[in-house]
Structure formats: structure tokens, C-alpha cells
Amino acid sequence: MKRFCKLVLATAAVLLLTAVVSVCAAALSGDVNADGAVNLQDVLMLRKYMADLPVSPDLAAADMNGDGAVNTKDLLLLRKLVAEPEPTKPTELNVLATGKIMKITTDFTETFSGNVTGDYSSPANAYLPAGTLDVLKKEVTDPETGYTYYLLGCGRRVYTEDAEVYETSGKLTENKVSVTASVAGGYTTVSLNSAWHVPFQLQLTPQTYPYVNQMGDFGPKYDVTSFTATAVEMTFSYTTYASGMPDVSESPLFSAATWRKNNDNTYTLRLTLRKTGAFYGYHVEWKDNQLVFSFKHKTDISKNTASKPLSGMTIVVDAGHGGEWSGTYGVTSGLYEKTLTLQIAKKLQSKLQSLGATVVMSRTADVKVELHDVATMTRKAKPDLFISIHMDGVDFESANGPTCFYYNEYSAALARSIIANVDATYQKHKETTYRGAKWNPYYVTRVSDCPAVLLECGFMTNAADEALLKTDSFQSELAAAIASGVVEFQKSLP
């Protein structure tokens, strides 16, 4: 028994010594800047590294949980290790704005730049969900259109019909937010607990618009030559305190999340994309006092069979016009646009389904569907893509050929892929003006939930275009070309 006890004690001593040595060896785990100490400076360096700033951390030391990767989980462990202090919370809420408080009443309310009065849509201005509050600065009127807007404290305008008075004489206090993230169901969801329903801005950055100083038919032109964003930035107005670091380590979209305190009573949450341009749409809404962002994942078709390359995808196909919305009409046949769009949309539906996609149609009969209802239907479907079918028409017959329009930056590549295939189909039959992919603020393309395009299949006011467009065989060729563009686009996604 004594010998056994001694053996146990000796073994315990060895284990204890081993544990002490292990602890000592692990003591420098977290020494990200390799200065021999683990402190807040290491936290700061790891934050910078995860925000893609030019720093060179010791990655072995930064791998706090030893899983072979450096991500948000390691940052959380390092913060806990060094007991990083939370920012000082205000003991009293300061009043940041007073006056007439407005409440957004329309879901997905479009916002406009506040430094101009024009009715100019811009993909750089995020929509605001119903329930958002802000102080009214003044009412403004666009002298060209006569439209009226509320200029809000966040610096953007909304149509007067999209907001109502919440308090005739109120105050907005400084806001506090905390954030969490989850990954499920094809989305990365970022949820912010907010003291009240603050306005916010969401931007994809960096992104340049080389023609924005040129005025088109609908104001500044937001055409993009390529989609270059490496991060999503959400800036929250009237916010002086932010806590929590969303864990995005399991997200296929984001590699890091960081907070930035700004000098104008705002905080910015920056989500770094894993790959440049790897962004596929988002949805945002208020759920009680929680602002919920749902960022769409890419539907991976790489393992699909050659005969069903679009399996797993959901695509909304919108047949433009309908009912009393007849659209343009043919110069020789007298056919209405609404008739041809429905014929082509049905053929496209059949083709996409044959390739494995689930297709949601905005209409299947000669009925009028309000544009707002098309957008709502699209959001509810949670699709991978949205395609609206239209016909062009002008006052002179020489204009010819198809055009594909987009609004959001991440829709441009889809427009280019579709128009390349559609134009090639035209060239088999007639020489056609190549009109390409262009930016345009068509209402249905402004949904943010997925890449969305509007295809003008050709000019019904051009006799040669019309002669092709009204034939069953060419409509089938167009449907096949659009579907080919979809497959090529989806395969090309980062």
C-alpha cells in the first residue's frame, strides 16, 4: 500500500510538473505582436489583422484555440484572457436630437441623398425598414417632379408618403447596441439589440462608379465596370456605445467583424468578405427592438449534374406588364408587350425548371400585378435570382436589339452574362446593335435580396426585331439563351 501510495504520489508529481510546464509553455499563446507579453496591444493587432489592415501578427500565437485557423473565436478568447475592459457605458442618456420625430411606415422605404433635391435613386443609399425613427429636419420638394420628401437627421430623404409623425415634439437619446451572429438556412444573420429604432446606412466598400458624374435619363449613372467590394459596412446613427463581436467564423461570407467608433455619434460594424465581390444580397427588418440583417449565401451548383446544373436554386421570373398595363406594342402586328413577355416568361420558366431550378412566376395570366407586389413576392420567395422580362419601344424605328439592366452592384455580372447570350442568339438571325448591360433604377430591380435584372428582349417598334420576337421558335431560343446566361453567371460566382 505504501509503495502504491508513493507510486501514485510520484506519478502525480510528474503530472503536476508536466501541467506547470504546459501552462508556462502556453503562457505566450496570444502574444500576437511577439513582444514577450500578452496584453491589450495583442488584441489591437489581432483586430487590425482581421480587418485586413497591414499588420504581421504571429499567427501561431494568434491561434488561441489551436484549430489551425485565426478567426473571431480566437479574438474572443484573447479578449477574455487579457480581460479587455468594455467601453464605459454612459450613466445618463444624452439627448442628441429634438423636434418632430418621424416614423417610417412603409417596408423597404427607399432613401435619397439629402444634399440634393432630385428624385435620383442610388444603390449607395440603403432602404430603411418600417418602424425606423428619426428627427425631421425639413420638408423638401423636387422642383422638376414636384415630389415631396422628409429630410431626416441621418442626412437622407424619404418620400412623405413613406413616413408619419410619431411625436410632434420629441427627443432622440444616444443609442446603445449589442450584436450577435448566426449561420443557418443559407444565410448569415447579424442581429443588433438596439435601445430604439435608429436609422442606419449599409454600403458595400470599396466600390467605384466611374460614370456617376454623368447625368443619364434617371440622374447620376451608377454603372460599374466590376464589383470590387471587400466588406459590408453598416453605420448606425445616434449610437455612442456598441458591445459584442459577432462570431462569423462559420460564415461562408465573412471572415471578420470589427466595430469602429466615429466622430459624429455613429458606430460602424464592418464585416469583411472572404472573397472580393462575394456578396449575393441581403434583407433587413425590425423585430421588436432587434434589427436583423440576413445576408444571403451563394447556392453552390458545382456538384450538380450536367443535365441539372441549377438544382437547388430558386429563381423569380417576372412577366412585365399585364392587365390594363399593356406596355408598348408592335409596329406591324399590333401585339402588346404584355402578351410577348408572358409567352417568353413561360418558356423561360420551363427551360429553367428543366435545368433543375425552382421557378416562381409573378404572373401566369393576363393580369395586372402591382410593382410593389412583385417586389414583396420576390422577398418572400428568398430567391437566388430575379429576372424581369420586357420589350422595348421608342418613337423611331431604327432602334433595335436587346438590353439588360441592373441596379445593385452585385447584379451587374448577371446582366452581362445574360445579354452576352441573348445578343449571340440575335446575331444568328440578324445584325443587331449591341446595347449591352446598363444601370437603370427600374423599381423591380431595386430589391436588395438577390441579384436582379430586367431584360428588354428587343424593340417592338423595330419591324425586324418584332418579326423575330413574335415567333414561337425565337422565343424558345431567347429562353434558352437567358438560361445559359444564368448557368454561366452562377458558375462564375466567387
Where are these regions (language model features)?
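Cellulosome-associated attachment modules in secreted, modular CAZymes
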Residues: 5-92
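Extracytoplasmic/secreted envelope proteins and their assembly/folding machinery
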Residues: 40-47, 72-75, 79, 342-345, ...
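Short linear recognition/processing motifs and adjacent strand/loop elements at protein termini
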Residues: 87-313, 391
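Extracellular/periplasmic catalytic domains that process cell-envelope and extracellular macromolecules
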Residues: 128, 143-144, 308-310, 353-354, ...
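Active-site histidine-acidic residue metal-binding/catalytic motifs
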Residues: 294-377, 381-383
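A short, glycine/acidic-enriched catalytic loop
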Residues: 325-335, 393-420
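Active-site-adjacent mobile loop/cap segments within catalytic or ligand-binding domains
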Residues: 385-395, 405, 433-494
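Active-site-adjacent substrate-binding region
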Residues: 411-438
